[in-house]
């Protein structure tokens, strides 16, 4: 399961569908049943939870996100700290063939140390380093960065920041658009213990979504073991 990617679209979609079904089935407090009729009528896409192409959140994005109780500058600082964490983990991951030298890490560290996170400064830095950072990160297409969304909703997103995509998901759910429960959980960071950063889908968030106590592997493994016992 951990090796599934966007390119394995049918298998990955099936695994995420089963994950949603089992999550609902395992929830003793949930009165919701999975709407198979709606699922069959819709076309479904694999949505990247977070594509770093969205860049640091803008003032407007932060201010209209009612879940954020911090300033736009603080949100952008958290974004770059998250990027630094992703870069650091990429250098330590022996599975990543595209190993990083220290230049991108050093650039982000220096930027963080300067402490200026106004919108224009952050956008200028991101425009300068975005391509090299994204080329070195890799693994944007792995299952721990994917979720199910209706095609008509997904294709309206484009490259937006995580905080903006999160706002759209919440609003779509409020407007009674069916959003799979695990997709909602992802953008609410339900799988992450004590989440404080809603600007970026971090390495820790991905690990919790994939392998945490309520994550994909744990949920499916429990189901498959029960099936085997029967």
What feature does the model see in each segment?
Residues 86-230:
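Long, cytosolic, alpha-helical-rich C-terminal regions that act as interaction/scaffolding modules
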Residues 1-124, 138:
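Intrinsically disordered, low-complexity N-proximal targeting/linker segments that flank membranes
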């Amino acid at each position: 399961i951990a090796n599934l990617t966007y390119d394995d679209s049918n298998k990955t979609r099936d695994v995420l569908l089963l994950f949603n079904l089992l999550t609902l089935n395992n929830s003793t407090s949930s009165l919701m049943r999975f709407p198979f009729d709606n699922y069959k009528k819709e076309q479904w896409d694999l949505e990247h939870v977070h594509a770093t192409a969205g860049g640091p959140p803008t003032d407007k994005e932060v201010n209209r996100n009612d879940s954020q109780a911090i300033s736009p500058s603080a949100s952008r600082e958290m974004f770059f700290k998250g990027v630094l964490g992703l870069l650091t983990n990429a250098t330590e991951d022996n599975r990543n063939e595209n190993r990083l030298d220290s230049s991108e890490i050093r650039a982000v560290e220096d930027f963080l140390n300067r402490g200026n996170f106004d919108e224009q400064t952050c956008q200028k830095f991101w425009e300068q380093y975005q391509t090299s950072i994204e080329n070195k990160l890799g693994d944007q297409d792995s299952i721990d960065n994917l979720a199910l969304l209706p095609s008509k909703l997904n294709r309206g997103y484009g490259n937006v920041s995580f905080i903006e995509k999160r706002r759209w998901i919440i609003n779509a759910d409020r407007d009674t658009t069916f959003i799979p429960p695990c997709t909602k959980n992802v953008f609410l960071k339900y799988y992450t213990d004590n989440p404080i950063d809603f600007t970026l889908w971090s390495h820790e968030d991905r690990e919790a979504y994939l392998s945490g106590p309520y994550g994909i592997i744990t949920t499916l493994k429990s189901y498959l073991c029960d099936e085997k016992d029967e």
